[in-house]
């Protein structure tokens, strides 16, 4: 008797399961498309009906569009979207990557990112473009071409809170002599750049507001791409594949990293890797060349390079260029502002590192562990390197070939020197280490970043530790 009852119960459960699957199967592509259209619209009754059908459907294809909607103000309709996501299981076990605790959007976004094969509705890319055009900026729709190749999951592209070019790039900005830069204090931090014998300083108090400078330095077109969220300023050559590119801010993020776009094709590029990831050039194989850049104090840069030019505060934009004005609280907090689901847990997300990629190998050096001042010898991708850290904490990396350098930096005649074990001195330059008889060891293109940003795109990164 008990066996018969158990058989009946099992059959009932199986029937319920099959019934749920059948119910899910009843949401045809046409009905789904109609609901997604209603979710884009302004007709409240249709919006609510679509949410209700999503809630009862058990169809996972509703999840990604509902998550997109949660990113925007919905008023009292937010409860209906959250209820639908809950019924679809997208609020079970989501962590939000340690940010926005208790916020449904973060939880659901983390849940979706954890799915090995997320189910997306037909036409999702075009739908997302229409949503962003309606809710943020009509110009954003052109980024979401359904025919374009994408090297990243489109459902994980996030809105960064601004319109396209809402963070305006600086194009060949006005420069002034160091002596005329009275608006800067000695401790203000700057990106120091030297290309073709010409030096330039880009104060962070200005770049915090613009995040991109398209410029010409030493007759070379360059773009200084700065992601404030991941703490990384990367200097790129503007030349790639025989073309010259200039860049702007798309207003979009991936892994809490700025997606910049080129103005020539409207392709989205990864700011940290210099690669096109979504759009006309995503399949091109292009990659921007990294160039050396250093973050140091204005006093140190001006002392080492009295001939330097520096950005004028007359940028043409009405901004408060007080240091730390737009992101000071974020820089001081250990919290992230947006999800970075691919970040490595080896270190806290906002640990600052100096990062290098050589011979196909990525390596990160936690700033707090580096000598200040001092030098370390190491290998990256089988290439011998030496990192020199000055008294401001500025880090420069050079090839060292078969030479062995001591751990001490010395000051003499207004310059900084490293010494080989045999006592021969090498002067730190922006392009190279310069040794006896004019010998040169090339500077390498490393830069700073928060650990979460770097490890999201270089998950196999080796981490240097103190001997």
Residue ranges of predicted features:
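Structural detector for internal amphipathic alpha-helices that build alpha-solenoid repeat scaffolds
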Residues: 23-27, 45-58, 65-69, 76-91
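Amphipathic alpha-helical scaffolding segments comprising HEAT/armadillo-like alpha-solenoid repeats
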Residues: 26-38, 59-70, 92-107
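Cleavable N-terminal signal peptides
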Residues: 11, 22-23
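HEAT-repeat alpha-solenoid elements in large eukaryotic scaffold proteins
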Residues: 40-44
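Bacterial N-terminal signal peptides
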Residues: 7-17
